[in-house]
Amino acid sequence: MSILVRDPDLKRVRPVLTAVRERAPLVHCLSAAVSMGIVADGLLAAGARPMMTETLDEAPHMVTLANALLINLGTLSTDGSEGIPATVEAAQGLGLPWVLDPAAVGIAPVRTAMARRLLKRHPAVVSANASEVLALAGEAGGRGADSTAIPDEAVRAARQVSALTG
């Protein structure tokens, strides 16, 4: 189930954070090189255990050890175009939840096509700014990782993306 979160309700967030801290899930991250440290620190602060790799040939195997998967398209490479779908497929085969961060989607055709294909794989969460949401819905995208759209402009598009992901 997808949820469009505008104003998070702390009563709903607290039990999730408590569960993460109790279970300490191992999260396999295929993240942009520029954000790996930040992602790892955020996961550690939440109580999860990050596992990073830049070797996409081994990523489908490494996900078999994980409890969840994060895919960030921030520095998509030719290897990523081949390794990411296989890793998502492996995670889904294990019933693992996965997060899609379509960083800077809408600025280049390869990245945009990859993000739209991944949406059809039903991520549990899509972490995107307003410009990225608009691009995922087939509307104009931004100019990089920073949003150029006003969040209120992306609400309808976010509902479309939510419907696509189930």
Predicted segment positions?
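Small-residue (G/A/S/T)-rich helix-start motifs and N-terminal tracts that mark the onset
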Residues: 1-86, 90-93, 159-166
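Glycine/small-residue-rich loop that forms an oxyanion/phosphate-binding "nest" at active or ligand-binding sites
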Residues: 72, 80-129
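Conserved phosphate/ATP/ADP-binding segment of small-molecule kinases
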Residues: 109-166
